[in-house]
Amino acid sequence: MDITNANSVVSLMNSVLAPSSKVGSLDGSAGDNAKVSIDFGAVLKSSLDKVDASQQKAETLSRSFELGNNDVDLHDVMLSLQKANIDLQTAVQVRNKLVSAYQNIMSMSI
């Protein structure tokens, strides 16, 4: 997933969530008027930043190994590449579910 595609998904979700920004805080019943504030856009952006960081780490390790750096082992490179792949596939599946949910909501009649 290209970072520009990820940014477009984030901007799409922010535009969808903008009208319902008042719903972002939940009253918790566990404490004395405890409030939990959840910003979905920030959580999504943070997750995408983590995916990007794992991709960058895997690319850096791979490049170091290709250039003959003795501090980088092949198994470290392969593990980081697989972790980055799993992170990316997870992000793609989350995106697919979000788009599907958005399409379901948009097709509902009022």
Swiss-Prot record:
Q: Does the keyword Transmembrane helix apply?
A: no
Kindly provide the name given to this protein in its UniProt entry. Flagellar hook-basal body complex protein FliE
Which top-level group of life is the source organism from? Bacteria
Query: Which keywords does this Swiss-Prot/TrEMBL entry list?
Result: Bacterial flagellum, Plasmid
Q: Which GO terms describe its biological process?
A: bacterial-type flagellum-dependent cell motility
Keyword Cytoplasm recorded: no
The protein's matches in InterPro entries, at most eight in alphabetical order, are given as: FliE
An example Gene Ontology cellular component term from the record? bacterial-type flagellum basal body
Gene Ontology MF: a single term: structural molecule activity
Cellular localization per UniProt: Bacterial flagellum basal body
